[in-house]
Amino acid sequence: GPESWDDDIIKEIEALGHEVGYHYENMDICNGDIDKAWDDFRYHLDKLRKLVEVQTICMHGSPRSKFDNKEIWNKYDYRSLGIIGEPYYDVDFDKVFYLTDTGRRWDGWKTSVRDKVLQQKNWIKQGLVFHSTNDITSALNNNQLPNKIMFTMHPQRWSQGGIPWFKELLFQTIKNEIKKILILRNQ
């Protein structure tokens, strides 16, 4: 959203050698109108590409929305826009382990509405379950992590101190409880 759009920061991220991708939520923004979502997607992609190179995209889970942002690809093809990858379609999770801090925790799949992959059950059986960053670093130090891992992180959730940290903790805790209710209601 607008709070995460800062031209100078976006350019600086690329200047540091990082890839900049588009974290889209157009089905949600356009109330499920797939054609409007496509137009909105292209508009924002073009706007971002005026600043930096963009070759990858990833949907925003939008847990409170009744619309799944990935559904835009049921009709349209992101590759036609020069996009080379969308993780939920282009990563083989049989070969790549997935860790996300969704819900401000590394085992956020328990409360995630849309940020899920089918292989999660297999990883749980293999003992690849991590609650804290310390759990992950311990597994790394003990050579217990797979060779290929995709991380999805939300840096604002890991603030260093005081009020911002507590505010994020409180907000994410409330959000996780709401998502649990949504998951139970949708079963």
Name each model feature, range by range:
Residues 4, 15, 27, 34-187:
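Terminal accessory/targeting
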Residues 2-12:
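Alpha-helical scaffolding within the catalytic cores
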